[in-house]
Amino acid sequence: MSTVPPGPVPPPNPLPWEARESRGLIAAFFDTLGLLVTRPAEAWERMRETGDTTSPLLFGVAVCWLSTAVQGILIRAVGMPMLPPFLERRFGQWAAFGGGIFAVKLILAPIFIAIALFIGAAILHVCCMLVGALQNSRSGFEGSLRAVCYSEVSSLASIVPVVGPLVAVVWWIVLAVQGIERLHHTTSGKAVAAVLIPVVVCCGGLMLILLVAGAALLTRFGHH
């Protein structure tokens, strides 16, 4: 008789991406994407809590890579032709050179995306610890990693010009709060606090940098 303890039991109706072996890779990816966009609460409920860190990481990398690729293609296909003639002459050679950089960026992007997802999950997990959101958690760090990776479906909103990045940030916050609440079995208040701490710190840090840079410029020009 085997003495190896049984692994985590997957949900009876698993997330499509977590059953991609039977559903097919492409179909499972887009079914999961659609579920997170249209019925996120159901997606979080159907998600397993432990036993598979590969699936969320692969999904997060794939959806971020897709967003990066589409943004780059749209900029080159739509943005560059709309430039005035004098700017087109100035940036024409740069655009050709930039195409090569873009190709290299797409090749290397999965590595950097995966690293960023792990760092983001670690930061969020520490914030969950600070606010006491892990008291009833059975998933530990894996739950935080899942919340971060699957919430990256929001990055697709950044494809939309001007307002897209802001929508993506707000959407990510909403999804991450739902994910933390579900996967760590915590209250909505603690989930909101855990998610907003790094967001507020990042925004505050960015504003501080801008203020310091602005003050330095004013001081420099004030002496002339």
Q: Can you say where each PLM-predicted feature lies in the sequence?
A:
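N-terminal juxtamembrane cytosolic/stromal segments of multi-pass membrane proteins
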Residues: 1-66, 70
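Hydrophobic transmembrane alpha-helix segments characteristic of membrane transport
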Residues: 39, 44, 80-81, 125-131
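Helix-boundary and loop/linker segments of multi-pass membrane transporters
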Residues: 46-50, 91-99, 184-185
